[in-house]
A protein has these predicted regions:
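HEAT/HEAT-like alpha-solenoid repeats
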Residues: 1, 21-35, 59-73, 98-112, ...
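Alpha-helix N-cap/helix-start positions at coil->helix boundaries
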Residues: 1-2, 40-41, 78-79, 98, ...
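Alpha-solenoid HEAT/ARM repeat scaffold
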Residues: 5, 9, 25, 44, ...
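Hydrophobic residues within the alpha-helices of tandem HEAT/HEAT-like
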Residues: 10-18, 34-35, 49-56, 72-73, ...
């Protein structure tokens, strides 16, 4: 898999030097072919080839790429879904907010409800990316994000809860549109899993330190 990862990285570097026409004629067909292959290893490689060509191709080809990526998100093999989740965080940043809301948020929700915690934990980064792309004033989509955030916070898997605790400063406002919820972190500090408690306490400690540095002393008039 290391060789495959290095090959994907090399292909993406090559893509940056290709013209839009070359990307449409050679790179995109390669991406689609790998994504439709019978072997999951080929699909895993294909997952990493969507971000680099996206902005270089026509709207019609972009739509084709999104549709094919959707099939990877819903693949039967957990390894493929994991790789799709890993790359989706970068992929959504290439798109306008309207497309993210209409097409990518449903994909995110599908992954966030996956039966494998190894897939669900990767959706934390996707949540952060989506919330950065979608304007704050689009309350309907942020309502979906907030619901997903709460589900991840209360996930049955400690690995997912740990990931949320570790990235809490990123998933809290202004990104997701809710006020900072210290009680959630405080509750995490009492969870039985040591790693989750440690991560949460670290965040609370950093917040306390930051607050003490920014708080100015008050002086009374004589």
């Amino acid at each position: 898999m290391l060789t495959s990862s290095q090959a994907v990285e090399s292909l993406n570097k090559i893509c940056s030097d290709l013209s839009p026409k070359q990307v449409e004629e050679y790179f995109v067909p390669l991406t689609i072919r790998l994504s439709k292959a019978d072997w999951f290893t080929s699909k895993v490689s294909g997952c990493g080839l969507y971000t680099a060509p996206y902005k270089k191709v026509s709207p019609q080809i972009q739509e084709q790429l999104r549709q094919q990526f959707n099939t990877l998100v819903r693949d039967d093999t957990p390894m493929v879904r994991r790789q799709a989740a890993t790359n989706m965080a970068k992929f959504v940043k290439e798109m306008p907010a309207a497309i993210v809301v209409e097409e990518m948020i449903p994909m995110f929700q599908h992954l966030a409800g996956d039966d494998q915690d190894s897939v669900r934990l990767l959706t934390v980064e996707i949540l952060i990316s989506i919330a950065e792309v979608v304007p704050k004033e689009q309350q309907s989509s942020h309502g979906v994000l907030l619901t997903s955030l709460r589900s991840l916070i209360e996930d049955k898997s400690w690995r997912v809860r740990y990931m949320i605790a570790d990235r809490f400063e990123k998933v809290q406002p202004p990104h997701v549109g809710v006020s900072a919820d210290e009680s959630k972190l405080t509750r995490y500090c009492r969870l039985p899993r040591p790693s989750t408690r440690k991560s949460s306490r670290g965040i609370l400690s950093r917040r306390s330190s930051s607050s003490s540095k920014t708080t100015k002393p008050k002086f009374e008039r004589p």
